[in-house]
Amino acid sequence: MDPVDPEVPPWHHPGSQPQIPCNNCYCKRCCYHCYVCFVRKGLGISYGRKKRGRPAAASHPDHKDPVPKQSPTITKRKQERQEEQEEEVEKKAGPGGYPRRKGSCHCCTRTSEQ
């Protein structure tokens, strides 16, 4: 093992940081990219500010009227459109519902060969 300069902080030692920078991808490979990615993406732990929604004001006029029911024709059209989209996805996917391309992630540039 090579000697390390004692004046250099530990986070700047050789091999302490991954060669490829972290990204926003949540695929399995990117979740195990480094310790930070594993904690944030794999375990879902973040120490950032928690956003909480405020309760709606009861005096506001928009909150008093109930939501009108949708006509059955609109819901039928939505169902038909959703079924068509599912069929398109099944056509694009290979056997078992997996994409035909093997070993590549659609959201990052790395493939299984790397």
Curated annotation (Swiss-Prot):
The cell attachment site mediates the interaction with ITGAV/ITGB3 and ITGA5/ITGB1 integrins, leading to vascular cell migration and invasion. This interaction also provides endothelial cells with the adhesion signal they require to grow in response to mitogens. It comes from the Viruses. The keyword NADP does not apply. Residues 1-24 are annotated as: Interaction with human CREBBP. The modification Asymmetric dimethylarginine is found at residue 52. The keyword Acetylation applies. A motif (Nuclear localization signal, RNA-binding (TAR), and protein transduction) lies at residues 49-56. HIV-1 lineages are divided in three main groups, M (for Major), O (for Outlier), and N (for New, or Non-M, Non-O). The vast majority of strains found worldwide belong to the group M. Group O seems to be endemic to and largely confined to Cameroon and neighboring countries in West Central Africa, where these viruses represent a small minority of HIV-1 strains. The group N is represented by a limited number of isolates from Cameroonian persons. The group M is further subdivided in 9 clades or subtypes (A to D, F to H, J and K). GO terms for biological process: DNA-templated transcription; positive regulation of transcription elongation by RNA polymerase II; positive regulation of viral transcription; symbiont-mediated perturbation of host chromatin organization; symbiont-mediated suppression of host innate immune response; symbiont-mediated suppression of host translation initiation; symbiont-mediated suppression of host type I interferon-mediated signaling pathway. It is found in: Host nucleus, Host nucleolus; Host cytoplasm; Secreted. This is Protein Tat. Transcriptional activator that increases RNA Pol II processivity, thereby increasing the level of full-length viral transcripts. Recognizes a hairpin structure at the 5'-LTR of the nascent viral mRNAs referred to as the transactivation responsive RNA element (TAR) and recruits the cyclin T1-CDK9 complex (P-TEFb complex) that will in turn hyperphosphorylate the RNA polymerase II to allow efficient elongation. The CDK9 component of P-TEFb and other Tat-activated kinases hyperphosphorylate the C-terminus of RNA Pol II that becomes stabilized and much more processive. The record marks 11 as: Essential for Tat translocation through the endosomal membrane. Zn(2+) 2 binds at residues 25, 27, 30. Belongs to the lentiviruses Tat family. GO terms for molecular function: actinin binding; cyclin binding; metal ion binding; protein domain specific binding; protein serine/threonine phosphatase inhibitor activity; RNA-binding transcription regulator activity; trans-activation response element binding. One of its GO terms (cellular component) is host cell nucleolus.
